[in-house]
Amino acid sequence: DYDSEGLILLTNNGETSRKLELPSTGWLRKYKVRVHGFVDNKKLDKLKNGIKLDSFRTGPIDANLEIQKGTNAWVSIGLREGKNREVRRIMDYLGYPVNRLIRISYGPFQLGNLQKGETAEINKDVVSNQLGLMNKLK
């Protein structure tokens, strides 16, 4: 998503890439989302059991209002799948257009203090272990 920022995992290993995409890892993907509007916690609570979006049903979504500043609010979102533009579609469904989207974690991998444009290499053994590929990565 061109208008998103934050953590992105890059690899040139096809098996690793595929494994990272699958919801079967059970990994929680966390986002900080700035939306336009006055956020109602009751609306966010509707996401706990998943919702019907277009042609699919989402899994459970953890959503919490972090701070309301004027007509914008920061919401934290946690989900275990990653369909195309899913966070934006979820917030649109609730009536809150997204004006900033930052992925802060992807399973065990955290954005931490990395600044925009910075990179950090993850040891292949760590990735292999986290994905259950045990010594398969070269």
Predicted regions and their residues:
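Basic, flexible Lys/Arg- and Gly-enriched helix-loop patches that mediate nucleic-acid binding at interfaces
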Residues: 1-138
